[in-house]
């Protein structure tokens, strides 16, 4: 069972995500928070495997999900199983600059809120397994707009996928 904490300032979004992800037999929503400042305390208390973080959330110390991801990484946050807590950014603001910042902050993935429920559940599973997940269109934009947060191998795979090939 993958233990998931949801962090989004919009209650309707949090509750909808909890309801949809709760239908997955291998995912357990262990908590929900509405601000960046609540993330560290909730992680320390609930010890989730994966934290879904919105980019823009209110807070005085941690004002966005990217800062929260960095704080969790820097604190060495661990899950109930003793593994490092992994973070997945889920946001409306799908900009290449955010993608780079998130990955530099230690986030394991970045997807937009337009992502379907099944794809989001799969992204959580992949992040939990230690893989990096980046929305394909954002990854492609990142390649075009400057320094890429992708490794050379990831960029090669993306180029192959975009051209219809396999790597």
Question: Where do the PLM segments sit?
Answer:
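Short amphipathic alpha-helix used as the core "switch/output" element in two-component signaling
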Residues: 41, 63-83
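Conserved acidic segment of CheY-like receiver
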Residues: 1-13, 17-21
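Acidic, metal-coordinating helix/loop segments flanking the phosphotransfer/catalytic sites
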Residues: 32-50
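Active-site residues of response regulator receiver
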Residues: 54-55, 91
């Amino acid at each position: 069972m993958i233990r998931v904490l949801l962090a989004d300032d919009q209650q309707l979004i949090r509750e909808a995500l909890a309801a949809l992800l709760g239908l997955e037999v291998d995912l357990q929503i262990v908590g929900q928070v509405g601000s960046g400042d609540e993330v560290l305390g909730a992680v320390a208390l609930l010890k989730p495997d994966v934290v879904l973080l919105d980019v823009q959330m209110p807070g005085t110390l941690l004002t966005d999900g990217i800062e929260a991801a960095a704080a969790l990484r820097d604190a060495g946050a661990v899950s109930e199983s003793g593994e490092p807590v992994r973070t997945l950014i889920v946001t409306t603001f799908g900009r290449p600059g955010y993608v780079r910042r998130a990955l530099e902050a230690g986030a394991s993935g970045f997807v937009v809120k337009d992502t379907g429920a099944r794809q989001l559940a799969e992204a959580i599973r992949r992040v939990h397994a230690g893989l990096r997940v980046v929305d394909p269109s954002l990854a492609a934009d990142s390649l075009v707009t400057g320094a890429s947060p992708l490794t050379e191998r990831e960029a090669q795979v993306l180029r192959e996928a975009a051209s219809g090939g396999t790597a």
